[in-house]
Amino acid sequence: MTPSLSFLSRWTLMSLCLSLAACGSLFGAKSSRPSTPASTALSADATRSPAGAEAVLEIDAAWWRLFHDPVLDGLQTQLNQGHLNLHRMAANVRQAQASLAAAQSSLWPSVSLNASASKAQEKAGSPAHVLSVAAPVSWEWDVWGRVAALNAAAQANLVASQEDLALVRLSAQATLVQTYVALRTAERQGQVLAQAEQAYARALSLTRYRYEAGVVSAADVAQAEVQLATAQAQRIDVHTTRRQLQHAVAVLLGVAPAEFTLAEGTWPQLPVLPDTLSADVLQRRPDIRAASQRVLAAQAQVGVAQAAFFPSVGFSANVGYRSSELSNLFSASSLLWSLGPSMAMNLIDGGQRDAVKAEAKAALDGAGIAYRQVVLQALQELEDNLMAAQQLQLQAAAQSQAVQSARRNLDITQAQYIAGTVSFLNVVSAQASALTAERSLLEIQSRQRLASAQILKNLAGRWPTDQALN
């Protein structure tokens, strides 16, 4: 059964942005929460799901299991281990983690150790040696929220990088499913063509027998030979396509094509789609979550820019020793210490702080627009694939009827040809129609599986519990 998307109201769309609502006042930045216009509501004829009617099963890590194909399951495991883009994005996550750790270090006092040895001379005196050892301590009191904003930006960037990794993983998984389905489709196309070859070879033998008996002309034999050779050429082409798709699978797995082989197997099952899908599951999409985190990071950077207009307040302390003689350096008489607050403020900077603040606000506006674009794109992708699944189901039913009719027509035409009431040209036409109908049905069924994979990708692997793993 094909799904329909439950009515996506103004509040459902705005809920995608709800997590950003409180960020405006957090660091002194005015909220610029991205909004999604109500005109983007989907499927006006869709039914509304009752509240609480759908339980959602978390199967993000193994959504391809809905195709019930053990070989595909094994390939997905290899993908998670060998796909090169995943390793690259994982490195980006580690980089963001290090950036967050660096930002968090600003919350703690900084302790240093200084040591020096110098020789100085005053006008009236003789040269003297000066030895010193000190341990200065400094700490910034985050009165204006600058350090907190830096930490919030680093945290949001870390989460965004993690969502980017999840998006790359999800995209790679979907690409593998699509390539695998195309490969298995090529195998089935090859099987159909092989069966057609056998039928055409029998027809050619029959035609040659009838030609030798003087019943038909040499033209009929030539037509039968052309029909057989054409099917053979098509099967070779399909075999080439299958090999190329196998190479594509190898590259996805991070393996050299020459080192990877995949035996022929069964076609993945078509997932059972639920009656309705809640649009709320779009909030789980990694691209939407990453875009929302980048809005938070940009908003935090506005807070950092605003804090620069206020003085930096902190405390500093210094404990050490100073002496002209090494033997007396660490004695009580050489002890020096200081403790007190500090404040620093930039009075004239040529408009630099204003420019930095304007830059941060522009970046926030851009992040908000990018977020809205990602949401709208997600809605379009889901709507397109839901509509495709619905239409492909109808198309598959109609094409199945066409295949049955083409087979009946071929049987009737062959019987008429044997009876001598029609020419072999009629048989050739009926054979071509039957083969075309069967190959078209395979193509539609393949597109159904691809549409299901796209829907799962659009929903980030979430599926109603009662229909997820039937």
Model-inferred region functions:
Residues V216-D220, L376-M387, V422-L425:
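Glycine-rich cofactor-pocket loops
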